[in-house]
């Protein structure tokens, strides 16, 4: 094996290893750590009837526990709250309240600078349903003409205190995906420059990319199983975790599909280039 072949092979291996790290880390940064991506994924839970029913019940319970109504209007309030628990999702201002819920929750979990002490010490993840509680308050005020103050924050626990360390590590390291991506690009260019037959480099990069797509798929299933097995604080937390994992796996699956298609294209290009260069070599040898 010549030095050029060794350097080229090393470049291919490094490019694949760094790509294996860069792609899932970039996805996590764009879709979990960054607020807009998190809102896009978690926002889909707003269309899940079972989850929203449980969330509405939790919001109504929080509202009931935060107010002290006079006896004469308690029966009227009970009817209004039952209506809220069963029909909140049909309110025109519900989607906006749910999006605000998701945004507030992301800031509490990933914007660690100004987190309240309760969120920092009791659980790794919390869902701030105060926008939904305020929504119930506003509709309750319309029905009863009674305006009631509610807590600024209404937190639903989504995990255990030990889970926060994982969240903090993800938030700290995921934004550094570009370092691995840059290293993969440099390694790939080094492999192409050092190679005697660049077409073979493309072939191996394509095959490696297809293998990585399979590895990412298996890794996503494994990670989903591990996270899914973690204990949840309550029924709302368990349902949120399962539905969010399903949405996240589907989102990452789209990236895997694009990577597989790109890798297949690189592989085909390498095969074609290898065939063409082989024919040229045969012609020059015969002449």
Residue ranges and their predicted role:
Residues 9-184:
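Cytosolic/nucleoplasmic, non-transmembrane interface domains of endomembrane
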Residues 254-277:
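Acidic, carboxylate-rich catalytic segments that either coordinate divalent cations
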Residues 24-47, 200-203, 214-232:
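Membrane-helix exit/juxtamembrane interface segments
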Residues 161, 165-168, 207-262:
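Membrane-proximal extracellular juxtamembrane segment immediately upstream
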Residues 1, 5, 46, 167, ...:
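Membrane-helix interfacial "entry" motifs
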